[in-house]
Amino acid sequence: MGTLYLVRHGQASFGADDYDNLSPLGHQQSQRLGTYFRERGLQFEAVLMGSLKRHRQTWEGIQTGLQATHLKPLVWPGLNEYDSHAVIHTIHPEPLAKPDTPELYKHHFGLLRKGLQAWMRAEAQPQGMPAFSDFVQGIQDALAHVRAQHSGDVLMVSSGGPISIAVGSLLGTPPESMIEMNMRIRNTAVSECVYNPKRTTLVSFNTINHLDADAYRDWVTFT
């Protein structure tokens, strides 16, 4: 039986023109996670990641901390995040102000929740995105690939949306509950699963043991 480690990317650049770019803290979080894995003696036989810049940057930080230059990741576009701007646009086509106050931040994520619900129910189709059923299938295909091709420790670097879909599908929860999981996944949090050729089973969700020290108290982020 193998172990699959689902990792959300490090802190990105929320509110900036280019969100798909780790912040300085995001790079630190990623490298710290790699160091934690190395200290635990983990040796990954494979790495899968989405094709977004923040996925690559997160893996590079993990790889540095892990000191595993020999590992070459398999890029899996099915692990990419949904386009939050496209999701919000389906229910609020007018431009939004940058969410740089608590009120605007809350408003932004309130709209995102409503847009995700509409997409999941097939009541709206965000431009440039797959149908929700196809989005789910891309994630399920990644899990199936791991079951079919591997038997040891595997690392998967993705985003909050795909990870919440993966966890929700393993637990059999309704799509709406996946939205709440999505909003709670912390940057570089680890969700651990065990797997064999027939099934994948969740062991833990959204853990940040690598940041469990006073020195890293301010490193816990959600965006």
Please tell me what each predicted stretch does:
Residues 34-111:
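Phosphate-coordination/substrate-recognition cap region in phosphate-metabolizing enzymes
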Residues 40-42, 146-151:
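Glycine-rich phosphate-binding loop signature in dinucleotide/nucleotide-binding domains
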Residues 99-134:
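Short glycine/proline- and acidic residue-enriched helix-loop micro-motifs
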Residues 155-166:
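A short beta-strand-loop-alpha-helix capping motif that often carries His-Thr
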Residues 36, 141-145:
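A generic secondary-structure signal
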Residues 2, 74, 80-105, 133, ...:
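Acidic, low-complexity terminal tails and accessory targeting/binding regions
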